[in-house]
């Protein structure tokens, strides 16, 4: 949905291609985000409104949903239904769908049968959302799950969780992670308000037990995929922490 012609069309085609390829390979679930349009026709950059307390932001949101987001996702729903592939939306800030309410709105607007949620707790924690409650609330709309943790740091007491002290990474920087076109992943703030961490380093086994329990009520066979973005641990250390925590949590289910 990005208005940049070097970014939006390519990402949109990736989603369509993933659905088609999934059907050919017998893969029944593909994961993506919902995307974010500009705030008006002809806009050049995506625009995300945190709280539309001013009516101008409601105008922007109405355009983003009614003119761009809903038509696109109606088409994706039709393609997914034809292919019998479930499209799992990661509820991620800076997208149209970022919490249970926006997930439900999209599902209602497009009469979803093959578009639902990927339950990734990490993006919910820092918004103050309880992933267990969110899973129970969305129920059958949850198609897939990721295991990634978030730690809320002391700095959140000073700057809150809406901390914008990110830095720019040039596209030609050796550490740059391309997000399409000339876009890159921004540099994380020092003394950040929150961090993504390996499973178990933000929330203990008790939480993960209840999270697995809630997922099992939706679908006992649902895969829970470990996702590693902990900058303080290497990949094997992060995988070990996540696996040990999830195994301990699973052992408590009966």
Residue ranges and their predicted role:
Residues 1-117, 209, 236:
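Active-site acidic/histidine proton-transfer and metal-coordination neighborhood
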Residues 235-253:
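C-terminal helical cap(s) of enzyme catalytic domains, especially alpha/beta-barrels
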């Amino acid at each position: 949905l990005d208005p940049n012609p070097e970014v939006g069309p390519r990402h949109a085609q990736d989603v369509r291609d993933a659905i088609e390829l999934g059907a050919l390979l017998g893969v029944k679930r593909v994961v993506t985000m919902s995307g974010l349009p500009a705030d008006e026709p002809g806009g050049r950059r995506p625009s995300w409104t945190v709280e539309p307390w001013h009516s101008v932001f409601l105008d922007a949101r109405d355009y983003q949903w009614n003119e761009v987001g809903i038509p696109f996702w109606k088409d994706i729903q039709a393609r997914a239904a034809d292919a019998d592939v479930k499209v799992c939306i990661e509820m991620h800030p800076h997208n149209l769908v970022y919490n249970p309410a926006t997930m439900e709105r999209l599902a209602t607007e497009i009469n979803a049968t093959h578009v639902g949620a990927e339950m990734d707790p990490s993006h919910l924690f820092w918004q103050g959302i309880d992933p267990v409650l969110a899973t129970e609330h969305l129920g059958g709309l949850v198609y897939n799950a990721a295991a990634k943790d978030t730690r809320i740091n002391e700095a959140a007491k000073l700057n809150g969780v809406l901390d914008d002290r990110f830095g720019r990474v040039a596209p030609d920087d050796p550490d740059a992670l391309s997000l399409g076109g000339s876009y890159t992943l921004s540099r994380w703030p020092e003394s950040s308000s929150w961090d993504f961490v390996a499973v178990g380093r933000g929330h203990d086994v008790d939480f993960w037990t209840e999270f697995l329990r809630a997922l099992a009520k939706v679908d006992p066979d649902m895969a829970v995929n470990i996702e590693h973005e902990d900058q303080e641990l290497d990949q094997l250390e992060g995988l070990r922490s996540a696996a040990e925590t999830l195994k301990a949590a699973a052992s408590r289910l009966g």
